[in-house]
Amino acid sequence: MNTFGHFLRVTTWGESHGRAVGCVIDGFPAGLEVDEEFIQREMERRRPGKKYTTQRKEVDRVEILSGVFEGLTTATPISMVVWNVDADSSAYESLKTVFRPGHADYTYWAKFGVRDWRGGGRASARETAARVAAGAMAKLLLRRYDVKVMGYAKEIAGVSCEVDDAEKAFERAERSPLRMPDERAEKEAEQRLKEAMSEGDSVGGVVEVVAKNVPAGLGEPVFGKLDAYLAYAVMGIPAVKGVEIGAGFEAARKRGSENNDPIVLKDGRIRFATNNAGGILGGISNGEDIVLRAAIKPTPSISKKQRTVDYEKMEEAEISVKGRHDPCIVPRAVPVVEAMVALVLADCMLMQGLIPRSLL
Amino acid sequence: MNTFGHFLRVTTWGESHGRAVGCVIDGFPAGLEVDEEFIQREMERRRPGKKYTTQRKEVDRVEILSGVFEGLTTATPISMVVWNVDADSSAYESLKTVFRPGHADYTYWAKFGVRDWRGGGRASARETAARVAAGAMAKLLLRRYDVKVMGYAKEIAGVSCEVDDAEKAFERAERSPLRMPDERAEKEAEQRLKEAMSEGDSVGGVVEVVAKNVPAGLGEPVFGKLDAYLAYAVMGIPAVKGVEIGAGFEAARKRGSENNDPIVLKDGRIRFATNNAGGILGGISNGEDIVLRAAIKPTPSISKKQRTVDYEKMEEAEISVKGRHDPCIVPRAVPVVEAMVALVLADCMLMQGLIPRSLL
Amino acid sequence: MNTFGHFLRVTTWGESHGRAVGCVIDGFPAGLEVDEEFIQREMERRRPGKKYTTQRKEVDRVEILSGVFEGLTTATPISMVVWNVDADSSAYESLKTVFRPGHADYTYWAKFGVRDWRGGGRASARETAARVAAGAMAKLLLRRYDVKVMGYAKEIAGVSCEVDDAEKAFERAERSPLRMPDERAEKEAEQRLKEAMSEGDSVGGVVEVVAKNVPAGLGEPVFGKLDAYLAYAVMGIPAVKGVEIGAGFEAARKRGSENNDPIVLKDGRIRFATNNAGGILGGISNGEDIVLRAAIKPTPSISKKQRTVDYEKMEEAEISVKGRHDPCIVPRAVPVVEAMVALVLADCMLMQGLIPRSLL
Amino acid sequence: MNTFGHFLRVTTWGESHGRAVGCVIDGFPAGLEVDEEFIQREMERRRPGKKYTTQRKEVDRVEILSGVFEGLTTATPISMVVWNVDADSSAYESLKTVFRPGHADYTYWAKFGVRDWRGGGRASARETAARVAAGAMAKLLLRRYDVKVMGYAKEIAGVSCEVDDAEKAFERAERSPLRMPDERAEKEAEQRLKEAMSEGDSVGGVVEVVAKNVPAGLGEPVFGKLDAYLAYAVMGIPAVKGVEIGAGFEAARKRGSENNDPIVLKDGRIRFATNNAGGILGGISNGEDIVLRAAIKPTPSISKKQRTVDYEKMEEAEISVKGRHDPCIVPRAVPVVEAMVALVLADCMLMQGLIPRSLL
């Protein structure tokens, strides 16, 4: 279950404080030129060590060990490694026998009877570095078909952004430390974030991802629907607690006549006048933008005191999680959600035969 | 992609106006006594022909064709059939060449170049009868392990119910035509629904499902997380546009200190003082109730006039969808969401070894 | 595990003496005209009730319950049912508590703790009726791409046929009660079969299947190789104990210089001068005929006395299996092996993009 | 399709002359002590650079990058890397545009339009180093349940060994340069091999693997039968052209009364008096030894002149494959077949619940 995808399959491996994290991409078509700089730029977007993020210093350089020959993919598995450089387990020594609230410490222990307590081990968000590397490959592939996947923080600490145009929002957000597309909202969110930080607390938010130029016909009813697949992909990202498509939960409050997107002809092609459906009808893409939002919970690692249990002594205890943590994971979650969406879309295009097995 | 599940796999088949719908359940353990009455009661909960639902008359009797011998499951595939009795395609004749807005008509046509236009064909919610039949088998299995899956309409037409206790809410909702647990909310929702109906319109809502006595340890990180699997299962139900777990989108507005569930000892066992996590941490169940909500869009079939395209003439057209439709699909969606949750939980318990291959 | 295939997936269900056997085909492309007569002819080739076969009378009429609309496939699941008409469990009553040697009686009991003792239940070769029905659909699809799958009994009771041309061999074999392409061998095999029958015994043989006009490029290294996939498909047929490709076990006795097929140009196309490889190199089809042989063990049901164990009394016992059994299953196994080969080839062509999702 | 297994899944990656080969093992239970020395000994058994093998010098040291913490497996993915040290592509430069007969050169090119021509790239038997590493982990797991997987060369160059006792045969073979258990046969085979070598030619043979103490109940009918799964696993090994179980192709020549294994009581337990079935009935293990044979073709790389095609000039050509090649791959294939058998058995034991998710 560390493998994602049907036709294009990504297997990730590695722990937060182990030697490395990495992935193997299988089913990638032959003949794509690998733009390593692009991959590195994607890694950079998720990388820690910036404002409002953990101060762990990781260069996150991706090494490709297989599957590429003379600059081209060969349709054989692409093995990518990101070495862990700045893992520091000392802060975790004292947490060895207590479960951090809001983390997977207890559940891993309950499931497997053993856990790597250093920095969350496998459950650490560090694993998502491998997803971003794989997602970068998917984006390179989609780029060739003019499909763009763009994300930003739609909301942080309860402050929501107005977004008219996803492309502009994306560009604006890329220059924002909170990855928010709306300056006014950003200011307010920043204020709330600082307040939380000053109290040793954290905040959450909502990531929105829009995919443009997605062809109609993607998705496999009745269980492998495009929206079901996206929900699976995105809900499996650490800290995500909700996923919605198009109008999402708001659709539940609308009338049918409001929510149904009128079908029209534009330039002789069948299109939709509105996009409450978020680009998906009956689990199949309809040619409009795919619009998806993910609810990101506040970072569970906080220095504020919390109640927990010490399982060696089997007694209640107090905990204050030190170490280097993101007070808000939302900005760094954006490229991860994008990566998963890109992987889903590339996989569906391959399944639908819209991307061939070989580009040559 | 008409198969759902890993260890416990359900394949559904059939079209709304074809001869039957049905399913094959594979991987079901040997030795379970099959309570056919229970299965039939579950079918009855989803069955059309009642107040505020389509008036199509279907007895929805399940026939078991294989996999059961002398009343016990044998671990071989269980084939179940529900014959279509009251399909009436006449209302659809006039819609043959126009796409119904909010339906899968356009996308099936775009994907496959052909579609069964009678009542939505495969994309019809009639397919969910097969899911409920399979889900009933999963519930029978879970019942043996004291796991209960209970759902109700949390919200209809924007009117939300107060719920303290899921078990009582479930019981109350079972006696409600809107399957709402809160009488006051029900009255108001009923009023809004009637208004919509009088205008040839429809409404949506939110289904909440709670699973009790779920053991800790279910779910397969990092991609096959329990919440990801549930999101996949539930987002794939027709009309669902959003899924959230525990505090869900509200979690995005909380502080870490509010959202983290304190870990405590109750009767010497590790438990959680609150349940914002909805019973899942790091993608693995933590022993608390699983709490999930699904946003259900308003029924797309409305008699109100809508804009669409006639694809034979390739020109814009108006459409008014006649036929027998649910003005609000939420009450009938409840057992479907429950069925998918039950299938996920049974599958995870099998994968985790908590349910053996043979109960004998 | 009652599902076969990756892209084109077949799920079979049903027991020998249950109500029916059937299958659900998922992933079948849209737009194929369904030739029901062809399907029925394929069923006829496997049907019991002929010379040298069990005298069980089954018309084996296939009913299609879904996935076909106005004569065309719609890319939705195709559900097919074959009702059991002439099941007679009385002969099995006395065998309820003894394991038949050479059968799956003991292993099903050991695995599941319960078994349907009537006619072998799920382990009966009757299940292969569903495979032949599904295989017929695959053949219809392949026919459109001029791919032909032809089988015959290469050997029965140790008597082997000379085969020069697979197409002629197939045609000759279709008129032979033993499905043997070589008259001289057939006479001798018939003699040996009659001898065995007169002693209440049975014989085995070898089925050879040749697939013509298979495009190069099918198969997925390194684990999903075409030969591995074929071996999986064919070894899973009841009574098969060995599978070989091309020169097979004989290749193990050759020199490299003899076994390597020289690569040549024929009419400007790259071809192979010989076909020891059986059309597969490195797990990928090379454009030559696929040649596969399966070893079929002698029918385990024999009236000759055998030693066994009565597991109720837990003591040794003697058994003489009465009932209506094939003294040699090889002729009826031929269409089953063909069906599995056809399913594999159709699946691989879909995966490789050589057959599109929609033929329209 | 570079992933093998259902519950225990192995993904291999890497090319012969790339930077490394490796694998990721997913689904491995928690709590197993990792005996790195054992893994290394297994690598040593497959390692090149010995008598009658290629003279490529590879230390084949396995590095474990994840999934192990404080010496114990953690149920998270185990990433293993074997760096390529002595790859020398110079001998392949001249073969860039010609297909080597008997190799996958043509088929990879036909399938993907591009190929890594250095040493066979992904199709090289070097990939099996990763399989042996993964297989070693499976063996460690099986060892805990007393299941032993032992292989040897049953036949080389047409010379067959007598084997009475698999355990003794295995031990004897481990000391033999040809990995043959029978000294007389070994001498003769060695003679024939030398003759072939002197003519720039190669020979093939048959590997036999026996698994002892395999519990009854493994295998998933009707498609995922244990024998089908083994056939899939073993036929997918480079150079394998045939697989048989128990009596295999010989069973096809026997009478039912000879081939059926009598069922008897030994020490109060149900057992089989003979083992023509090779430990598998109806696709499920019966508690007897699993016996499997694989036909290995002669090494296709020979210095003897062969006919081929130069695809740049698109004209016929002659080829003499220089470089460092095994004149007979059989001895080195033995641990690879064992590895695949071990992976299958461990996977089936996990699926059957005979190995738990955590050993703690």
Swiss-Prot record, chains A, B, C, D:
Cofactor: FMNH2
Superkingdom of the organism of origin: Archaea
Keywords assigned: Amino-acid biosynthesis, Aromatic amino acid biosynthesis, FAD, Flavoprotein, FMN, Lyase, NADP
One Gene Ontology molecular-function label: chorismate synthase activity
Ligand binding (FMN): R122, A123, S124, G282, K297, P298, T299, P300, S301, R324
Top-tier EC class: lyase
EC number: 4.2.3.5
Transmembrane segments: none
Pathway terms, separated by semicolons: Metabolic intermediate biosynthesis; chorismate biosynthesis; chorismate from D-erythrose 4-phosphate and phosphoenolpyruvate: step 7/7
GO CC, one annotated term: cytosol
PROSITE patterns: CHORISMATE_SYNTHASE_1 (PS00787), CHORISMATE_SYNTHASE_2 (PS00788), CHORISMATE_SYNTHASE_3 (PS00789)
Cofactor binding, per record: Reduced FMN (FMNH(2)).
Catalytic activity: 5-O-(1-carboxyvinyl)-3-phosphoshikimate = chorismate + phosphate
GO biological process, one term: amino acid biosynthetic process
InterPro entries for the chain: Chorismate_synth, Chorismate_synth_AroC_sf, Chorismate_synthase_CS
Binding site for NADP(+): R46
Biological role stated in the UniProt entry: This reaction introduces a second double bond into the aromatic ring system.
Family per record: Belongs to the chorismate synthase family.
PANTHER family membership: CHORISMATE SYNTHASE
UniProt-listed NCBIfam families: aroC, PRK05382.1
HAMAP family xrefs: Chorismate_synth
Protein name, per record: Chorismate synthase
Source organism (scientific name): Archaeoglobus fulgidus (strain ATCC 49558 / DSM 4304 / JCM 9628 / NBRC 100126 / VC-16)
Gene responsible for this protein: aroC
